[in-house]
Amino acid sequence: MDSANKNTKIFAEQLGNDFTISVDDEDMEMEYPLRSSTPTKVIDDQREILLQKASRISKLDEALCELNNESNGSIDLSIDSFIPSYDEFLHKKLLNEDTGHESKVSDQVKQVISTPMSTCFEQWFEGEEQSSTGNNQDISYSSVNSLSPKRRGISLMSIDANKLSPKKTSPNSGYITSPLRHPILLSETEPGTPTKNDSPAYIGLPSQPNSITTLNNTNQKFQVPDNDKPPMSSLNELSASYKPIVFDSSQHKTQGTDNNDSFYHDDTNCIHLSRLEKIRELLTFVQLELKYYVEPLKKELQETKTLLAQKEEEISNLKDKLQNAGLS
């Protein structure tokens, strides 16, 4: 019993930092009387709660550290070393030069970003379910070295927004074509039906007055003078010589490359999108954790403001009473 009256200190070590929390037995006695519960059970429950809080604080600190490293571009990983080589490879590909190191660079890119970035943060969002076991190895995120974002982080400063090309709507649609509209020949119009081609405004002839138009038969077709009508042979030659405009990208491609590769953006193996996905998940985690800590503080601040307003009102009433009594 005498030892139960002393202060009990619990030490939780997370990520190499000493995190010390002291718990007074007097508070535990108010919540859990010693006669109704054993002291060992009380201490175990308190230790589990404190370890959960320490784990959340350490994970939040690590996430903030990761965001700071991303903003400074100070993460030193192998992916940063061959980003210039990959850009050089793309430049040579456009110039139709030798690309012998294509497979080597592509394999390096796929090896680094083959695993989705979300796997780095799966344990961050598991909450208290995993931390309730009380095992320090399960609680500490840094113990999972294979999934640590520090091993797979990408510096933010190496992003070049100008190199992010838009994605093609349909990779299997082939060449991008922009066909011209087929010219309409005068001979293709049905007799007796006025069209845009043989109307006076279209041909350039002055339109007839309304009085003359009403006198003519509605089925009568406007006739174009023979000397103003272009010869039919020239129109047929123009129609026969028409060819749709086709974009030829063969000069920008190397041998053995699919024709559709240069027209769409590869979202799966894009190192820039992977980096942005990592930053998005980091920001989401930090936002949720800060909300966990900020919401109680906001509530406490609102209650304090309400209490302060009540005290100010009481002080104002006392001043009025003193003034009415002539003591002010």
UniProtKB/Swiss-Prot annotation:
Under what name is this protein listed? Uncharacterized protein C9.11
Which residues, renumbered to this chain, carry the PTM Phosphoserine?
A: S170
Q: Which UniProt keywords apply?
A: Cytoplasm, Nucleus, Phosphoprotein
The scientific name of the source species is Schizosaccharomyces pombe (strain 972 / ATCC 24843) (Fission yeast)
Subcellular localization is given as:
Cytoplasm; Nucleus
Question: Which cellular components does GO assign to this protein?
Answer: cytosol; nucleus
Major location category of this protein: cytoplasm
The answer to whether the entry has keyword Cytoplasm is yes
